[in-house]
Amino acid sequence: MTNKALIPSQNSRLPAKPRPRAKGFVELLGRSNFSFLQGASSPEEMVSQAVEFGYDGMALCDLNGLYGVVRGFQTIQSPSLFTASPQVKENFHYLIGSELTLTDESSVVLIPMNKQGYSHLCEILTLGKRQAAKGFSKLSLEQIEKYNQGLLCLALPPWTDERYEKLEKIFDNRLYLPLWRDLTWESQEFCRQGFALEEKYKAQLFVTQRPFMHSPERKPLFDVLTCTLHHTTLAEAKNKLIQNSERCLKSLEDISWLWQDRLDLVEKTVEISARVTFSLNEIRYRYPASSLPSGMTPTEYMRHLTLKGAESRYPEGIPDKALKQIEHELELIKDLQYEDYFLTLKEICDFASERKILYQGRGSAANSVVCFCLGLTAIDPVKMDLLFERFLSRERREPPDIDIDFEHSRREEVIQHIYEKYNERHAAMVCTVIRYRSRMAIRETAKVFGMPLAKINAMIKFMGRDGMKRLLDPAVAADFGMEPGPWKMFMALAQQLHGFPRHLGIHTGGFLITQDPITEMVPVEKATMNGRYVIQWNKDDVDFLRLMKIDVLSLGMLTCLRKCFDLLRDVKGRDYSLATLPADDKPTYDMICRAETVGVFQIESRAQMNTLPRMQPRNFYDLVIEIALIRPGPLQGGMVHPFLKLRQNPPKEIKYAHPALEPILKKTMGIPIFQEQVMKMVVAVADFTPGEADELRRVMSSAWKRKATMGGIEQRLRTGFARHGISSEYADQIFKTIEGFANYGFPESHSASFALLTYASCYLKCHYPDVFACGLLNSQPMGFYAPRTIIAEAQRNGVVVAPLDVQKSDYDYTIEKTAAGDLLRVGLRSIYGIPEVLIRRIEDSRKEEGLYIDLADFIRRTQLPRSVLLKLAAAGAFESFNSNVRELIWNLESLSLDQQSFLWGHPKEQFELGEDDDEPEHLPFESNWDRLRREYDSKGYSVESHPMSVLRTYLHSKSEALREKRFVPYFSSEDLKRMKTKTKVRVAGLVAITQRPPTAKGMCFITLEDEFGFVNIVIHPEIYQKDRTTIYTRSLLEIHGQVEKVGAITNIRAERILPLG
């Protein structure tokens, strides 16, 4: 019997008599926030709520994709999920699917029954994405028909006889029609249609809640999402919003009461679910088969390449220890069947080598001697006694992860090679999920509330860099035209929106490369960048399913070093590479100890430069420690300052809690700095295996991400420590150290890989400062410092920097040979706003036809538009034609289009610029300050003088006036070297760096630059809060404060921050 009336809501008064209860229920139409603005709960929330309600299962079916299915699957794998409630059933059935919007505006949900159906669903979703613009899908029923095998079809209403017959012809008994009751006339009409089809065709019906959220409390957020989707406000949305909060997950009791007239349709969901056997566990990944020499297996070829590489790496003979480790690693790689993975990476790196693209592997891969012998990494892990299990072990239960950095200016060549070799059917990049962050969440929610744009912008500005924190105070509501009540709701919704997915982006370099078509494993769609395709899963999804990805990353310093090596060979006649630079160079380490490291790799930050004089690195391993030391792990573990104290005042003897710890900690003076040390410690004194130790590292990382404790692991560690006679006091210290390493402890192998590049960049800066500056400037953007700081630093190191000149400057910065010696010539690339193709026109014409006769000849030959000519003039590029830049700009401003066209069309015609009757006889030359401003506006710096050298006269006169009034005068960075601690000073300079690291407890650090060097400013939280607008909006600052000295380091503790001028 059919009851077609609407049933009361779950929130209505329910009858006192016993309610009928269905024997089971599976929600088959779950939707999450990975439907992008059309779902108000995360996959984790949807699945967890279904489990809590005691459902037999749930299908996660987001719009046109499988974006969130792995997250839901991961939630189901959590053992703690099934202990939350006695109602929970451990045989909870997690299904996946997708809701597809078709070209006839109808919708169907497809759920794979088996592996074939899953592959078909991936193909269908990929086809729909490729036929539409990014963010949309375009599919016809005829296209779906081709892939219908293995798929259940849940056809969403409205239905007609014609539509039902068409779908039944395709899907036969795999076609089902969903019904729901949400207190709307629309759902009542759908029920009427469904019951009619059941009566006429024996259509298979089932019950769903058609949930867009896990709880009715998310209805306001769903309204915000809907308004954002339709670009409207809550006041204007009208019927675009759902009418009530019924479209959420409900308890089985409430579902049973809603459908007490048709409990069979509730229980039908369990029957439908039973037809589905597919699980994401069935996805089997096969790495592409490598091209092998005739008659060789992957295992044999891997061994051949490794031993051949070992002979090259160890020219005096392979050490027994290295050979034993090679055999151990090759055996494990064979057992885990990872040969093709390594061989694929070897092929990619060989391609880079052939193209002379500098690359280097890093991360845990540097713990592997096989990677070292294959040329994937540059660190000898046997010599450095690195722990292989940090990279690969049987206990890890996950594929190896090899990160390879390529030159950032040439990585695209490597990416295109991968696409060309494997094609888009077998290679795609891993996606990143772009989420709503604080500012965007506030902006979008404010738009939905109808706030004026001016107030929204004011609100964003008021937030500053503290996120939503400052807006949580109800007292600020009036400032933005709202009452405290609505403001509280507004902020609550913005906070809920924070972290929601917005759209997909491209991972920095993660590639999934497969033997089988990738679209049988995961849907693929267009990326924003032309010619790029991304899978619908991010790196965490890929890692959880244990799929192998390769990371083709980029590093600016590799670009810089390659360009430096080219310059050394072409200009200086020195043929160097990373492998042939002189090691243990004393002048290089002297420079490092003085913290003269602007522009070099990894040790150029403010914190590193403050540490170097205390650390006094004198060899390569010291650099390895230095790089790892200034990281959140050692800082949070309280290891940095104790280590530096030991470093400055080494004790006669270091006491270890256990003799087994001495070989592990001796190199770092008894204090653990690296992840590998922590792993070795638990192996030595807590009876962990190396593989279990790596699992500990993973647990630490997971605990840190969840801000959780490590529970049972702690007890096992303490038991092991006690067994080895380690006191509880020292056990507490070790455990605190381990917790400090959670997620942020730095791998020794990673630090060693970086240290190679650090030493190379320092050596070049020390011995060839002109070449290093040139390579660094030609590799921008990269690093901490702007070109102006790099140029000023080079000049302080004795480099002669020649200004822009269209007669001599190329696109890039160049080393120019002169009778007086080599000089660094500024490149035309330094000018703001001129495309490279136009700059190349200047360079090419000069090389083909010789130097330009005059400005008219330049205009005639290059045919550049007036806007570009004016930018060249403002940057000083025409001063070889006329040193009076004001006159040049006047002449170019007065150049009419007719005159310019005349020049372009008459290559031999002589034509004088500046014949305008309004031109004055002579324009006065600029003042030094005007010249500086012009050059800074056009390219960000001047090679002639530093702004502070021009302002110094003004500051000196002001200082004299201040002294007469007994106020604190201004001092330069040079003056500060002679100042005593607690001396009151005023300093001024250009802002070089502003940093506010999360480990600094609200402190802010600024590096000011003047004509003599740098001034370190320390800003405490209360001063930062008071003056932060000035800090972030002004490039020239005046600081009032007092001197603080720590060894050779001089800081100014700020008391007041003002704009200079």
From Swiss-Prot:
> Kind of enzyme, top EC level?
transferase
Record InterPro entries:
DNA_pol3_alpha_NTPase_dom, DNA_pol3_finger, DnaE2, DnaE2/DnaE/PolC, DNAPol_HHH, NA-bd_OB-fold, PHP_dom, Pol/His_phosphatase_N
| Cited SMART domains | POLIIIAc
Reactions performed catalytically: DNA(n) + a 2'-deoxyribonucleoside 5'-triphosphate = DNA(n+1) + diphosphate
Kindly state which keywords UniProt assigns to this record, in alphabetical order.
Cytoplasm, DNA damage, DNA repair, DNA replication, DNA-directed DNA polymerase, Nucleotidyltransferase, Transferase
Q: Which NCBIfam families match?
A: polc, PRK05672.1
Provide the protein name. Error-prone DNA polymerase
Which organism does this record belong to?
Answer: Bdellovibrio bacteriovorus (strain ATCC 15356 / DSM 50701 / NCIMB 9529 / HD100)
